[in-house]
Amino acid sequence: MIRRLSIAAALGAALFAGACQPQADSEGGEAATGDAGVVNLYTARHYASDERIYEAFTEATGIRVRKIELPADQLIERLRAEGEGSPADVVVIQDAGGMGRAAEAGLIVPFEDAVIDERVPEHLRDPQGRWFAIARRARVVAYDTARVRPEEVDTYEELASPRFRGRLCVRSSDNSYNLSLLSALIERWGEERALEWARGIVANMARPPQGGDIEQIRAVGAGQCEVAITNHYYFLRLAESEDAADRDLTSRVALSFPSIGGQGAHFNLSGAGLAANAPNRENAIRFLEFLTGPEAQSTFANETNEFPTVEGADLPADVSRYAGQAADPLPLPAYAARQAQAQRIFEQAGWR
């Protein structure tokens, strides 16, 4: 059933919007409330190439995309604060744990759609129908091919072994990608073993955590460490860089997709869902369907080097090279359910 804002709720939304600093959007203003020609997108994805998807959607449907872009935690807090008066129609977060938290807070709601169900595999859809994956990224190991053999980094466990004492680079524990990885390890191994692993990682750090994933790969290429934890697509971006030095270092670095218990590598997910009080529900559903279509899925693969969630998307050669890697079939609810435990383990292990 389409929910409609009451006059009081609409007034509340207007007052809230007036009290807030405007956020950048694809139309140059704030997201608005109900409008038959608009879909209001709240997104934590920060990729400029996503704008091409919004433009393609508008061209195909005539519906404009009004966007508010914020980091996931701020986006969730804004939705909480806006409550029933929120103008949000669609919520997109680049991390499965963030989507899970939004779902548990009631900020996105279950909906049924045959198109999405047919396109997106069941294991990439929330069991309660609240959200689904739109793109996937693997948490992999970048390693120095001159000093590390592939079989030495074919599991996550090996990264915590004495073999790599003082030879590992990794970013800080407050990064959502590391949080989701540790959440997956807790789900698969249990808390005690995951804590032991995190302590091993801290003992193996070549330097205090610093920089983003690209900086970890560059550190491997520069000989500052032998192995690093990163998302797969950052390596592909360096390989395609206009900077010759970046392209050159990728000839000395390779990727391993480590396995968890023989089931496959950890993949994190960008997800999308229907906002709880969407004033433009019909437009929202059309936009959500569009995200699973061939044009959007091919854009994720070709522009951000992510793995699509739908079969048949056009893949560039570098993404296609890794597309067959096995993925740990982690249940979607586990990403969010284990995050509090993961944060506690990071603190206990001294992973800053």
Where are these regions (language model features)?
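C-terminal motif of bacterial Sec signal peptides marking the signal peptidase cleavage site
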Residues: 16-19
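Short beta-strand->loop
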Residues: 42-45, 127-128, 143-145, 151, ...
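A bilobed periplasmic-binding-protein/Venus flytrap-type ligand-binding module shared by bacterial periplasmic
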Residues: 140-147, 267-280, 299-302
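Ligand-binding pocket segment of bilobal, Venus flytrap-like solute-binding proteins
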Residues: 173, 177, 184-258
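Early extracytoplasmic/lumenal segment of secretory-pathway proteins
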Residues: 21-100, 352
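Periplasmic-binding protein-like
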Residues: 166-174, 290-314
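A structural signal for short loop-to-beta-strand junctions that line the ligand-binding cleft
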Residues: 86-91, 109-141, 157, 167-170
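An extracytoplasmic/periplasmic, membrane-proximal ligand-sensing/linker region
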Residues: 194, 305-352
